[in-house]
């Protein structure tokens, strides 16, 4: 057992001897990554950096699936229990270095998340959340209306019974990040087979095979990072990975020249009326706004223009700079959501040459999942940090 980057890992015996060889004669590991969303793209890039012979396959373009629908709030604020909170916090802390390594601007911006309540019940909930986050060592300031106005003077918040500011949180443009990962991986020698449908995944005695676009592709390891498609992909290899259906709706605006927020990256505002969802907002790299409602797990299917117009009008009540912007509806997106809500990461005992990488909060978790998956595939490590998230829990 030894430590790497603060993570305890164990070497284990495997029939796949190429894992264990060292020095100049070490065999190059062949890996096929199915899925070029933010998680799959990050894994492909990380593997390519370690010298693996990587082939990435996606039925569409990089970052064009659930990744493109993500609100892309990088955080550990809304994560429970503490073990999962810490898992997300570790990945949050990796984003700066990860993004810089890509060599292009992927819209990574820090500034924190600001949220406020307008009722006594809402204030109690925020106060309780702030206390819990601080107990876990996560900076979270409890604010009154005056302090909130100092941080974001351009808001029109109406009633403020309490507010919290989580300064570590940030945002990124996940499609740009996925595209940059694939481009970087290709520069390192990876092959990208895009707009190519996978029709079979097979585990062999010492390898794994993918059939895609009529072509049979053999590899030492196949990584399944297909998001909502992972349940079907895993079943091809005899692995059970159940997911909940998790539709979500966000809207965008056209580019807005002026900054909508003075300091923070992400804004969460209370409902304007009892029984209506809360509103969340961020301004994208191109100046457009992305707006959603409810929590990041809320289910929504209304992607009509009427809904987009109404949601923008509600957001503009709190953010006057939005007035006059045009609402652009985005088709409903389906988010990866393992049945118990937690990541599914690792080799499956049922198909030991198939590696699963599935999670909600993929934008926050992509750097960490990429690092740990690479360690387990290239170094034959068993990472203790992943022990709660193994595919075998669904067997």
Task: List each language-model region with its residue ranges.
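Helical element adjacent to the flavin cofactor pocket in flavoenzyme catalytic cores
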Residues: 166-218
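Active-site substrate-recognition segment that forms the wall
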Residues: 45-49, 72-74, 105-108, 216, ...
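C-terminal catalytic lobe of FAD-dependent flavoproteins
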Residues: 310, 316-395
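Extreme N-terminal leader/targeting segments of oxidoreductases
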Residues: 1-31, 49
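N-terminal Rossmann-like FAD-binding beta1-loop-alpha1 element of flavoenzymes
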Residues: 30-55
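Dinucleotide-binding Rossmann-like beta1-alpha1 core, especially the glycine-rich loop
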Residues: 71-151, 278, 300, 306, ...
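Helix-loop-beta segment of a Rossmann-like dinucleotide-binding subdomain
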Residues: 106-117, 141-145, 149-188, 294-298, ...
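Glycine-rich FAD pyrophosphate-binding loop
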Residues: 49-68
